[in-house]
Design a protein with these regions (language model features):
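Polybasic, glycine- and aromatic-enriched phosphate-binding surface used to engage nucleic acids
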Residues: 1-123, 127
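Non-catalytic DNA-recognition/assembly elements of restriction-modification systems
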Residues: 113-171
Length: 171
């Protein structure tokens, strides 16, 4: 619509192939990657997992890494009361008292390690996520936390340094 007018500017004349400018960097490959979308501020308790169809724009944070099923399990945990209570205690509240999903807060959240969750429980958690079943998610999260406690009681000290599960990329 305004391409001709923008092409007349100094920046466009200097590098004609980049006649446009954006505030945020654009990463075209990001659209195709599976990711979790976290709205900056929202009254909605549902967290969306994108299978690679959408590109996150302003006021949307995202977490990428792993397969779609892995991200659904993580999204379910992020929707749980266990994590929401942590977020409410960490963040400042905005716009009607809703917490913010900013990186400095998300990085402090205690989230169960997905790799030690029994497959049957993980499948149940994913099913609850797909059915928008918050009560089921909370029940699964409670069971996961009990299981995690038992695993760490049996193996109190990991023998090697554990690598992070995900790459947290925030826009």
């Amino acid at each position: 619509l305004h391409q001709e007018q923008l092409k007349g500017r100094h920046k466009a004349k200097k590098t004609p192939s980049r006649w446009y400018a954006t505030i945020d960097n654009i990463y075209p490959t990001l659209q195709k990657e599976p990711k979790i979308f976290l709205p900056d501020i929202s009254a909605n308790s549902y967290i969306f997992v994108d299978e690679g169809r959408y590109y996150p724009l302003h006021n949307i944070y995202y977490i990428k890494g792993g397969c779609v099923e892995f991200l659904k399990a993580l999204a379910a945990l992020l929707m749980s009361d266990f994590v929401r209570n942590q977020l409410n205690n960490l963040t400042n509240r905005m716009n009607g008292g809703y917490p913010r999903w900013q990186s400095q807060y998300v990085k402090k959240l205690r989230v169960p390690t997905l790799s030690i969750i029994p497959k049957q429980l993980l499948d149940k958690l994913i099913l609850c996520y797909e059915n928008f079943d918050i009560k089921g998610i909370n029940d699964c999260t409670s069971d996961i936390l009990k299981n995690e406690k038992m695993v760490y009681q049996e193996n109190p000290r990991p023998r090697k340094k554990v690598q992070p599960q995900l790459s947290f990329d925030f826009v």
